[in-house]
């Protein structure tokens, strides 16, 4: 046999062997993996349907809320859009299953038998033709030795068989190569169809989401505005110190943990550096009307009183003696419960009995005197009953009345008490009330610090220095010249001999320890002991 024919034969057999032992098993494995991919598609579709159905239910619940209708509409639209895209994804799954996997599985089973038969047929035909050619060549060699007269005819027959054999092996190799190419082209064309289906799906998804996402973003950003996020009926009158982001509940679901510097006094923040302000905190220019509406300036004698208490995080309205029994406070302004049934509703001047000794995030829990209604209410809306009723529309500054009533010479500016309106005491530090006049800060800065440290915290910033309850308003309005002179003397002596700090600056070994404030998300009624 000629070497070139043997080479053609070996090459053709290698192609058939590659199809049978490599391509077809790989195609079977591809069908198996495709079925797993298909099951994952169905699982994804079912999980997405359940997930976005739950989002739609939450959005429908938000539509019933008077404060979150815009956000509820956004959630419902998002859910509908995603479910529509999920249905379009089913078309991709059907194309992948019907147009690719089924054809691959069917063709693989048929092709295995077809390639096997083709290989056997080629091998038998090649051997038969090779045997005939070998036989004719042997006969020609014998006839040439005998010098037979039919040698010429035999040579022509051998040449004809040789040409046929060469044409056969060449055509068989081209046919085997064509079969191999046809199979790879089938695989490429089927996946091209799948890719085209994916392209159509993603094109529709892009066109559907491109404009809607921008609209949802604008509506979501617009809902951050307090005028749209809350209705006027739920907010009530703008009296008392404001709450960040208009929060009217004692919980902080979305409040991140704050650094220690935000819970210390304004003066300590200047020494330790700024950790950043809360994004939702209102600026000092917006806090100014609230400071004028609810003034609470302690008198000189109560400001520098030497009465020591064990903690500076006591609840608002606690008696100076620290005795047992419920504390009573008087409402400065009206408070509406709105749609939240856990809030306490009362009017200005009502007396509320505080049932929880400590405030939680600036909220107290109490019971309206004379009724069985109980619930949460802002600490800034009430005042200790011992201070007496105060008209919120007519602020009283004790230092101003004391200065106008006293005929004494004006005090030295170095000893002058800064005239500023202090907010209702929360559970944060009051060290700025005892600052020396030289280190006093501006009123707007003090209020900015107070607005950032609204959440109750047990993290001490310096020595505990709780402020006792101020004098009743009746005493401030009817203070005589004798009381004024006594208060001024106490003030002068307090400024000359300031109270000793428990931990002087630089001696507290735990001054740099940062504690994480505790936050409760429980809106239910507390356990009253």
UniProtKB/Swiss-Prot annotation:
A Gene Ontology cellular-component term: cell-cell contact zone
Tissue expression: Expressed in the epithelial layer of the intestine (at protein level).
Iron in keyword set: no
Stretches assigned to the SH3 domain: 324-387
Cell compartment(s), UniProt: Cell membrane; Cell junction; Cytoplasmic vesicle membrane
A Pfam match: SH3_9
CDD domains linked to this entry: I-BAR_IMD_BAIAP2L2, SH3_BAIAP2L2
Membrane topology: Peripheral membrane protein
PTM-bearing positions, type Phosphoserine: 231, 272, 302, 478, 481
Alphabetic keyword roster: Cell junction, Cell membrane, Cytoplasmic vesicle, Lipid-binding, Membrane, Phosphoprotein, SH3 domain
Domain IMD: residue ranges: 1-239
Function, in words: Phosphoinositides-binding protein that induces the formation of planar or gently curved membrane structures. Binds to phosphoinositides, including to phosphatidylinositol 4,5-bisphosphate (PtdIns(4,5)P2) headgroups. There seems to be no clear preference for a specific phosphoinositide.
Annotated protein name in UniProt: BAR/IMD domain-containing adapter protein 2-like 2
Species of provenance: Homo sapiens
